[in-house]
Amino acid sequence: MIYEGKAITVKALESGIVELNFDLKGESVNKFNRLTLNDLRQAVDAIKADASVKGVIVTSGKDVFIVGADITEFVDNFKLPDEELVAGNLEANKIFSDFEDLGVPTVVAINGIALGGGFEMCMAADYRVMSTTAKVGLPEVKLGIYPGFGGTVRLPRLIGVDNAVEWIASGKENRAEDALKVHAVDAVVAPEKLQEAALDLVKRAISGELDYKAKRQPKLDKLKLNAIEQMMAFETSKAFVAGQAGPNYPAPVEAIKTIQKAANFGRDKAIEVEAAGFVKLAKTSVAQSLVGLFLSDQELKKKAKAYDKQARDVKLAAVLGAGIMGGGIAYQSAVKGTPILMKDIREEGIQMGLDEASKLLGKRVEKGRLTPEKMAQALNAIRPTMSYGDFGNVDIVVEAVVENPKVKHAVLAEVEGHVREDAIIASNTSTISISYLAQALKRPENFCGMHFFNPVHMMPLVEVIRGEKTSETAIATTVAYAKKMGKSPVVVNDCPGFLVNRVLFPYFGGFARAIAHGVDFVRADKVMEKFGWPMGPAYLMDVVGMDTGHHGRDVMAEGFPDRMKDDTRTAVDVMYDANRLGQKNGKGFYAYEMDKKGKPKKVVDPQAYELLKPIVAETRELSDEDIINYMMIPLCLETVRCLEDGIVETAAEADMGLIYGIGFPPFRGGALRYIDSIGVAEFVAMADKYADLGPLYHPTAKLREMAANGQRFYG
């Protein structure tokens, strides 16, 4: 053994060839943490010191090669002073460069996935052999940063600027054939042939058949582009990528600027340019929010996994109520491998559900994400029915009938009589109390909420709601089924609106106040979209439906009369009373026309302004910042209350619920992380400026205490 560490070993194989093997002890995957980097430095030094070494192959002892840097270390690292962070980055980069500069040929064998720092390690080798099932990529932009271990330097010198920009700016994972096509790897072989192919390559390089020094040299030199070629490549790509990423996600464009700045430098100077830009991005609130979001998502997955032991296996599911929602649930279950019965009392409901599932499956086939055979398989897994005949075999039933307590009570009581005693029944209610709905059941312990968000196939969140009598088995089984469907479940306790709708309606309340104070709803939409929301409040209400919004607001007003009851006539009342229900009937705040693709396109309708005139109580001169605060303060404060009331257990779950459920701007990290970014004391002071707008704007006593003590939601 030439070197043995806790993450890396180096052993002699044959004829002067050594194997540098990544196998991080106590972990299921390899990652670049401090320990691994330290091991790599010592391993490279050991290889350099051994005169008998003629070639190196790099392998992984795990099912994946290296998943990237250890993101849990980012939070503390990114707090370091700039100079210290740059120095640490350059120190790490020297390890990769020392490996690249070894006086012998190096070949890396890529199995599973090699992402971020994992793929940057691969690029430091002379040759790359990749398994047919492996994937490679540089996903750092998804964390608000760009590659920091030489990725912006080596990749453009390996595969050309255009290809490198596409890989880095998109952050996508690339399959073996695509990597080979652009020369990011040198060979692709079957997984079982990987070691053999790597050994063959290194032997050919040792014998002189392959000139490894000539292969290595372009990575050490400046980019082979003249000034005109550089201008054409970089200026065009910057404009295109800026349009794609938008102003709130600077990392993709900064990556291109870094490649451009370093284009005329050799490797070492180019890496210094990369390090300076990397640190600049690491210090942005966007990077801090996106790194936090990643860690919160990991926490969410961990919490969901903790329920696995208590969960019963769901082999057959059922959905009550077909239509668009039922069809979406059936599609999601079937396409992820769980057969499902889809029951409705009307044939047209069944047909609508089947049409929805067929449409969604057809789109996947069109995009090449599903074969026609798999589509047929998924469709066959959806069994339409108008009776309860087969419900005796069902493990879980999702009730998705109309949002009416009486109807739901009747349907729930009825289905309970047709399922096994241990079957779980879940309601897809968006606002009605689970404990109240459970009153219709003989076995309330087997009942919980399972709230999907529209459109089901696109929205990652499922709220799993615990009622007063819900058992842990019911929660665990529902969480496991949601995960099986490819969703991100968040367990919440029962209250009107649960987590997401309870938080969303105060946001709409803020919007109603803005309109009452003379704000043009089109302006409000533009301001909130610029803030980062996928759509503004007026457009969102049109998409949700004025009838749904009106009903939801009444439920919330009944549940929280002290702050959500509004005796004044609001914009939603006006639209609802005028039968302007939104997209569903072609008129709401906006009017809707069909575009060439048959999708509703919003247009400004003067009649909407006429209808709203009588409810403008006073015209206030409100800035864009005021408009943002009118809506964001109530949303954030209600999220705080949900955490304080124990509706949701952690800040991470609250924030991820909003990001996955209503499209809260990811780069802002969620409502509680947004408060942290402003500062708790500063946020409280800001809310106090709007105190005259009512109780929705009044911070809780506990939040004031946090402000006084300098506390945060995230350490």
Curated annotation (Swiss-Prot):
Active site residues according to the UniProt entry: 451
This protein's UniProt keywords: Fatty acid metabolism, Isomerase, Lipid degradation, Lipid metabolism, Lyase, Multifunctional enzyme, NAD, Oxidoreductase
Reactions catalysed according to its record: a (3S)-3-hydroxyacyl-CoA + NAD(+) = a 3-oxoacyl-CoA + NADH + H(+); a (3S)-3-hydroxyacyl-CoA = a (2E)-enoyl-CoA + H2O; a 4-saturated-(3S)-3-hydroxyacyl-CoA = a (3E)-enoyl-CoA + H2O; (3S)-3-hydroxybutanoyl-CoA = (3R)-3-hydroxybutanoyl-CoA
Pathway involvement of the protein, from the record: Lipid metabolism; fatty acid beta-oxidation
Site location (Important for catalytic activity): 120, 140
GO biological process, one term: fatty acid beta-oxidation
EC number per UniProt: 4.2.1.17, 5.1.2.3, 5.3.3.8, 1.1.1.35
Family matches, as Gene3D superfamilies: 1.10.1040.50, 2-enoyl-CoA Hydratase, Chain A, domain 1, NAD(P)-binding Rossmann-like Domain
Region named Enoyl-CoA hydratase/isomerase: 1-190
Highest taxon in the source lineage: Bacteria
Annotated substrate binding sites: 297, 501, 660
Keyword Lipid metabolism annotated: yes
Record-linked InterPro entries: 3-OHacyl-CoA_DH_CS, 3-OHacyl-CoA_DH_NAD-bd, 3HC_DH_C, 6-PGluconate_DH-like_C_sf, ClpP/crotonase-like_dom_sf, Enoyl-CoA_hydra/iso, FA_oxidation_alpha_subunit, FadB
GO molecular function: 3-hydroxybutyryl-CoA epimerase activity; delta(3)-delta(2)-enoyl-CoA isomerase activity; enoyl-CoA hydratase activity; long-chain-3-hydroxyacyl-CoA dehydrogenase activity; NAD+ binding
3-hydroxyacyl-CoA dehydrogenase, as annotated region: 312-715
CC per GO annotation: fatty acid beta-oxidation multienzyme complex
Protein residues bound to NAD(+): 325, 344, 401-403, 408, 430, 454
Family the UniProt entry places it in: In the N-terminal section; belongs to the enoyl-CoA hydratase/isomerase family.
Assembly with partners or alone: Heterotetramer of two alpha chains (FadB) and two beta chains (FadA).
Annotated protein name in UniProt: Fatty acid oxidation complex subunit alpha
Source organism per UniProt: Stutzerimonas stutzeri (strain A1501)
Gene this chain is encoded by: fadB
